[in-house]
Amino acid sequence: MIIPWQQVDSETLDNLLEAFVLREGTDYGEHERSLTEKVADVRRQLVSGEAVLVWSELHETINIMPRGSFRAGAEEQQ
């Protein structure tokens, strides 16, 4: 289930974004980027709609994923 990021308390959203970035451990190439920059990138993706907050009832977890991946996963389950 998609959770509208606008309905999440700002401090909670900040914590979710930071935890996601730390968990992902994404390599940004030659130039290391700060945690703040990485969090800002993910926030921009949420705001633009490229990424969505997804609640898994099965696992009782929340995740951030590309909108296209969420739709593809939902279609596969139907």
UniProtKB/Swiss-Prot annotation:
It holds the Pfam family UPF0270. Signal peptide: none annotated. Belongs to the UPF0270 family. HAMAP family: UPF0270. NCBIfam families: PRK04966.1. This is UPF0270 protein YPO0179/y3960/YP_0178.
